[in-house]
Amino acid sequence: MKKKQQILDYISDFSCTNASGCNYIALGVKPCGGPREYLVFPNSVNQSILQNLVTDYNEMDHQHNLQTGAVSDCMLVTPPNNIDCVNGVCTIID
C-alpha cells in the first residue's frame, strides 16, 4: 500500500542516538482484530504527524478488510520487547 510506504519514508527521515530514543506504534488491523505489526520509530519524529498517518492507514486497512472479506490467522501480535538504536535506526531486537 502506498500509504504504508509514505509512513516508512517519513520515519526514515529521522534518526536515533540510543535505545531510549526509540518507540513503537501499532500498524495495520488484522481482520479478526488487533494490529498486524508494530512499527518502531525514533522519538525525534513529529509524533502527531506520525499518529495521523498511522490512524489513516489503519482505517484504510480496516475498510479493505471489510470490503474484501479478508481473513487472517488471528494470532496475537505483541509489542516488541526489545528495541535498540542500530546505526541511527530504531530496530526490533529478537
Regions found by a protein language model. Name each.
Residues N65-D94:
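Short flanking/linker segments adjacent to small metal-binding domains or redox-active Cys/His motifs
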Residues M1-S20:
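Acidic/polar, low-complexity intrinsically disordered N-terminal segments immediately downstream
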Residues S20-E59:
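Mature extracytoplasmic domains of secretory-pathway proteins
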Residues I49-M75:
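Short cationic/low-complexity microdomains
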Residues Q6, G34, Q67-G69:
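Generic preference for well-ordered secondary structure
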